[in-house]
A protein has these predicted regions:
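Structured aminoacyl-transfer and RNA-binding surfaces used for tRNA recognition/handling
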Residues: 1-167, 174-185, 196-206, 210-230
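Short, charge-rich, low-complexity alpha-helical interaction segments
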Residues: 186-190
Length: 233
């Protein structure tokens, strides 16, 4: 078992809704052909009960309902089918069962390859349900995550981690971040330059009527966020 610092971008558009974040601590427990799924469920139900977060319901993939639902038979918890209960990192994966409290997923158990166990519970989600974590705005989460990446040595680039940092800081500055450091200032100045170029080129007769996709693909200007760019001037 361990605690891992994780970065999750899958729910990027939902960040700031009160339940979704980007960087968080994952409580992990792994078993390689030692713990059975039933033992793992028993362990996690006991754990949830011990911290006063007894699940309102759990979910299982429809393909595994008949086989797995009896594992919860001794617990006073609703079992629901969910086609999303399957996990993969691209190379390995498996069906999973997820735990919910107040309609918030607090963790899951992945039956990796059908023989191994991978348990993951988000620490911040647990604290949120317990009322021990203050909710943060979208811009606060974006700023904190950007600074975390910078502190961990990530450099701005067009690839991999550097691209993620670039995307996060761009979102920050467009939504009014006042953070003053080299990376934020670089992105801020670049976005101002992009907007000025757009304003200049878009007035030319040859460019009038060009679709929004043209500006996005040729110069990286997102017209749907033009009102945000205006605040950078």
């Amino acid at each position: 078992s361990n605690i891992q610092k994780c970065l999750r971008l899958k729910d990027f558009s939902e960040v700031g809704d009160g339940t979704h974040s980007l960087a968080f601590n994952m409580l992990g427990f792994f078993s390689f052909r030692e713990y059975s799924l039933k033992q793992s469920i028993d362990f996690m139900m006991e754990f949830c009960n011990s911290i006063n977060i007894y699940p309102d319901y759990v979910t299982i993939h429809p393909d595994k309902m008949l086989e797995w639902q009896d594992y919860y038979k001794e617990y006073n918890v609703e079992v629901r089918p969910d086609i999303e209960c399957i996990w993969s990192d691209g190379n390995i994966g498996g069906y999973c069962t997820e735990f919910y409290k107040n309609d918030i997923e607090i963790g899951n158990i992945v039956n990796t390859l059908g023989t191994c166990i991978d348990i993951g519970f988000g620490l911040e989600r647990l604290l949120l349900v317990l009322g021990l974590l203050e909710t943060k705005s979208r811009i606060e989460i974006l700023e904190e995550t950007s600074l975390l990446l910078i502190d961990n040595g990530i450099k701005l680039s067009h690839n991999n981690e550097g691209y993620i940092l670039k995307k996060l800081i761009t979102e920050c500055v467009l939504y009014g971040s006042k953070i003053d450091n080299e990376d934020f200032n670089t992105i801020r100045n670049n976005q101002i330059k992009i907007y000025r170029n757009y304003k200049n080129l878009s007035t030319r007769n040859s460019n009038k009527g060009k679709p929004d996709s043209y500006w996005l693909h040729t110069m990286g200007f997102d017209k749907s966020k033009e009102h945000l760019y205006q605040n950078l001037q």
